[in-house]
Amino acid sequence: MIEKYYSGVIEQIYNRIGKETRNIVMANYSNDFSIENLEVIRRYQSNEDNVFFAYSEFSYNTLVGAYEPFLDIICNMHRRFIGGSFDDFQKECGVYYLHRQVLNSYYETGECFREETVLLNEVAYEQRRMTMAIADMLKRLSEVRPLMIVINRFQMASKSSIETIKYLIDNPCANIGIVLGVNAIVKGADSTVEVWDRIVESLEDRSAIYYIGSAGPLKNNVKTTNDDELYITMNFEQSIQEASNIMEFLDFEQARRGCRIIEHKLKFEDAWIDEKSLRRFYMVYARTSV
């Protein structure tokens, strides 16, 4: 039955896009459930109508990136529907000038770069501006093509992704619909509790949380995961780059989690890393301590 109810929630929001202002809802269920094989997902992905459909399913065992999946949605939609200079697009959306270099480098190479350091007294301001930038770019793209996003296991999201959802709840867009699937049995990171509670409160006030049932018996691999149990690739150069990307997008808590995972591998699993990568790792780790 959970398949039917989950699909029903997705269809309801999909059909509200462009007609109603508030189109963000949460679908809560017990135990684990994957949306990859839902018929409604395949159908909307293959639709040739005017709505851009995207879905993402987070893992319990891997670290979620900063602003995931919104960053890749922005890049994909810009390439497909707008083209041209991504920097000009950012200027049009009012992206803070210090953030454009980070976003441009991610768009072009997948590796974030920033010349200017972040001032300690500017951290909170820059985090707000980055979240606003992500939301404003999504809104601008939705003017070109209405946007439907389904994110399953959303409780595993990074703080930056959750902050983006909160911003979109507070500043709604009729052209964007979002369904957040949440396994109520598994909790997210401690660093996300405060903003998570604010999201739940906002959605509850709007009767936008649906309880769609249980996915069956609890599976052994579904539990709250400690950081040292999260999987990372043993290609440490890649893992360090992923943590560095998260840090450059100012999600310092999530970047610190990534660094702690790498550190655990090095200290307790006798993993080998070359000296150059080790130096870079400690530089990234130190910069997450904001």
Indicate where each model-derived feature is located.
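Conserved adenine-nucleotide phosphate-binding loops and their immediately adjacent elements
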Residues: 1-19, 112-118, 222-245
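Walker A/P-loop-proximal flanking segment of P-loop NTPase domains
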Residues: 1-47
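Residue-level preference for the first positions of well-ordered beta-strands
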Residues: 22-26, 53, 146-148
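Conserved nucleotide-binding/hydrolysis micro-motifs of P-loop NTPases
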Residues: 31-34, 59-63, 155-156, 183-188
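Conserved phosphate-binding/catalytic loops and adjacent sensor/switch elements of nucleotide-binding enzymes
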Residues: 33-143
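Sensor-1/coupling segment of RecA-like P-loop NTPase cores
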Residues: 146-151, 155-213
